[in-house]
A protein has these predicted regions:
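Hydrophobic alpha-helical segments within soluble ligand-binding/sensing domains
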Residues: 76-102, 151, 200, 216-233
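Hydrophobic alpha-helical
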Residues: 21-23, 28, 35-54, 124, ...
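Flexible loop/hinge segments that line or gate small-molecule binding clefts
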Residues: 45-82, 198-205
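Short, solvent-exposed amphipathic alpha-helices that sit
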Residues: 1-3, 83-87, 114-135, 149, ...
């Protein structure tokens, strides 16, 4: 679309700090863009931004996570609940006869980093309730703002739960647990995570992560920009919900 004098400005925010999202949204509004593509944060913070975009007649697109009660021009990403449901099925291929699973989270002020992570966990728990209701699902909340405490918290968890052999995290930082397992020689733990970050892939290759569920972020972004251009330049109708395949 370079022939149409289009340009893209990227603004970043910390997904575990809602103040960071608010600051980034203010910076974006100050630019007076023709359109916005975003990976939204929690609904209550996203809505303040989208309300102002709507008031200014600025179309916006979601990637990564959809917020149904704050509908965008289009959404590109996974069905987060179905993704979590699928992850539970994969987990049970590994768990076999064992009866405990741990969910690892990264939290800030008691809240996970995105609506997407919450929906993945809902889908995961739905599958477990439907098919394996006797399983004990444990939780370990690591602090997003205090990474130096991760190893201590993991040490304490595994001391307290020495028989747990299966775990999952719904954020993109499975490498935190994978690298811990490597450094402590824990080769009998089945770990599932999300996203093809370099450190995640390294853990997959080393064997400390068994499965990575990817969601084609590059294709999400490319399709999102295309949808904005189709809407703004060519006045084409854009499909609202566009689910990406699970890799």
């Amino acid at each position: 679309y370079s022939d149409f004098n289009t340009s893209v400005k990227i603004n970043y925010y910390d997904p575990y700090d809602y103040h960071s999202f608010v600051n980034a949204s203010e910076a974006i509004l100050a630019l007076q863009p023709d359109g916005v593509m975003m990976a939204p944060t929690a609904p209550q913070y996203t809505k303040g931004f989208t309300d102002r975009l709507q008031a200014s007649d600025i179309p916006y697109i979601y990637i990564d996570s959809n917020i149904k009660n704050v509908p965008p021009l289009a959404f590109f990403g996974q069905n987060s609940r179905q993704s979590g449901y699928f992850a539970a099925r994969m987990m049970m291929l590994l768990a076999r006869d064992e009866k405990e699973i741990v969910i690892f989270r990264k939290i800030h002020e008691g809240i996970v980093g995105s609506n997407q992570q919450e929906n993945r966990e809902i889908g995961f728990r739905q599958y477990m309730e439907e098919h394996h209701p006797s399983y004990n699902i444990l939780e370990l909340d690591l602090h997003a703002e205090r990474n130096d405490e991760d190893n201590e918290m993991l040490d304490e968890f595994f001391r307290s739960h020495p028989t747990v052999k299966n775990g999952i995290t719904f954020n993109s930082k499975v490498y935190i647990i994978g690298e811990y397992l490597q450094s402590h020689g824990k080769k009998d733990f089945n770990l599932i995570g999300y996203d093809l970050l370099d450190r995640n892939v390294a853990c997959l290759k080393e064997g400390s992560v068994f499965f990575l569920i990817a969601q084609q972020p590059e294709l999400q972004g490319a399709n999102g920009i295309k949808a904005l251009c189709d809407h703004l330049i060519f006045k084409k109708e854009v499909t609202c919900i566009n689910y990406m395949p699970i890799d």
